[in-house]
Structures are given as C-alpha cells and as structure tokens.
C-alpha cells in the first residue's frame, strides 16, 4: 500500500508540475511588439511655468514672479545674445556622442543669469526628438551665432566610436519657432569649434585641429561656407595655431584667436593678414568685438579676459576664471557672458 500510495502521489506531482510549467510558459510568451508611436508635430519647451511642454489647448501659467531659478546649463561652450527676445541663448552639449547621440538642448537665460526657459529646443525625452515632424537632431554643439532671426550652431555628426569619424555640421534653427532649418555638412572637416555668420548667411568656422607634442598644422583651419552650401578652406596652417574664437571687426574683416599663441589675427575677406595683435595670455577661446573695434579675448586655458584697444597694449580686465570659453555680448546690459565648459556655469562681466 505504501508503494502504490507513493506512485499515486508522484503521479499527482507530475501532473501538477506539468500544469504549472504550462502556465509559466503561457506567461513567458513574448508580447506582440507595440506599434510605433505616430509622429507628432515639432514643438519647443515653454518658459518656466506649467505645463513644461505645450498643452494641446495652448493653456499655460507662468511661474510666479517672486521665484528665481538658476542652473539648466550643462557643458556649455558658447552663447549668443538675442536682442529680440532679450535673452542669452546657451547651447548645452549634453553627454558626449559616444555616450548618447542627440542629447543637446538650448536654454534661455535672463540678464542676471536666472533661467527664462530651461529647455527650449530639446525638451523631449531621449529618443523622442526623431519622432517629430520635422525631427530634431542636435548632437554636441559648440560655437553659436544669431543672424537675421536664425540660430546657427557648430554641431557634429559621428564620433560615436573609433570607427565612426566625426563630421562637421552647421545646423540652423528659426529663432521664433525653434524649428530646424538647413544643415550645412562639411565632410572634410572633423569638427568646427566657433562660427561667425555674415548678414548674407556666409559662415566662417574654425577647426582647432591637433596641437600638443605632435602638432599638425594642416589641421589648423578656417572654413568658409557660402549661403548655397559651398564649403572651402579660407585659411590653413600658420599663422593659425589651433584657431578657436572667430568674429568680424567693424570693417567686415575676419578676426581669429589662437589657443597655441597670444596672437589675435585679422584677415581680409580674401584671406590676407591685415594685422596681428597680442592678448595678454595664450590659450584663447572667446572673442567679442565692439562697434569701436575694441576686442575682448577669453583664455580657456589661463582664465583671463584681455581687452585690446587700438594703439594700446592689451590688459587683463578679469583673471582666474575657471575655463572661460566662447563669449557673447549682452548689448542691453553691456556685459560679457562667458560659458565655463565642464564647470556647468556662466561668468558675467559688466563693462
């Protein structure tokens, strides 16, 4: 009896096990893949308030005016001032291309550095940017400029790994709507640093290139991109030495600062050297030129801001700023605004 009882119980256990296994198998069956979300119209983020993203009915309530918010800047390398909105426009690079692509966004700041709009362009969650009409692509912008209602950004594609070469792309956005416009892709450039844009849409862009112990002068370049997209090298090699900041002087000449020297070099529109001035420090990045020709130069390596006035020696007006990068000029407040790269902050200097 004991023997038969054992067999009977074993049979019950086997049947139960088979039933449980069937149930688990049913539960583990993969669900049918969800249908991809339908594309949504392109949108940008609201200024501080609620909701953050635009509501379908357009409803929005601004943040109360007794609140100030600071921050929203991450790995910013440049800024531009928008005199129409009266805000400082800051491109945030986000994480590097080899971590996640399409991670950049644009912040608007008020004159005192407080946040106006935390994320204007790039408010979407990662991956959602491409599901808009038109899609948003903004990878790792460095230099920036605003001309005739258009935001120009020195961006890049590629660089996600050792077998994915970086390629320079200048992307444009409408300053009223935030919608993407044209993209100027320059296959022969590995990465633009700063840009300056003429009223007719001609773009001048620096490629800093290779310095250090094994410098490569062929990589020190200034490019010119015509409004129809034709790209050519404007200047290459010496007297450039890792060119960085670029701007126009009041005569329409092209002025470039070097990282590798103190030189501030003025080129004519045909690429000839007009003059060479000296900043107080080398390692220069930012360049602002005033209407009277006064130049301000920031050294991302040595932390100072030089002022260069015609017929006078350069002088430091600020010192020991951590990594002051590509400056912009806030004309309404007569101040320099200087992003500080990995310090995730901006410096403000009243003039």
Residue locations for each model-derived region?
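Beta-propeller domains
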Residues: 90-118
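Bacterial N-terminal signal peptides
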Residues: 9-17
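Short glycine/acidic-enriched loop and turn motifs that connect beta-strands
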Residues: 94-98, 158-162, 210-214, 261-263, ...
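Short loop/turn segments that connect beta-strands within beta-propeller blades
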Residues: 109-114, 174-178, 225-229, 268-272, ...
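Blade/loop signatures of beta-propeller domains
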Residues: 39-63
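A short beta-strand motif characteristic of beta-propeller blades
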Residues: 63-70, 115-134, 179-185, 230-236, ...
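A short loop-to-beta-strand structural motif that recurs across blades of beta-propeller domains
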Residues: 102-107, 168-171, 220-223, 263-265, ...
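Beta-rich, blade/repeat-based domains predominating
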Residues: 72-86, 101-103, 123-150, 182, ...
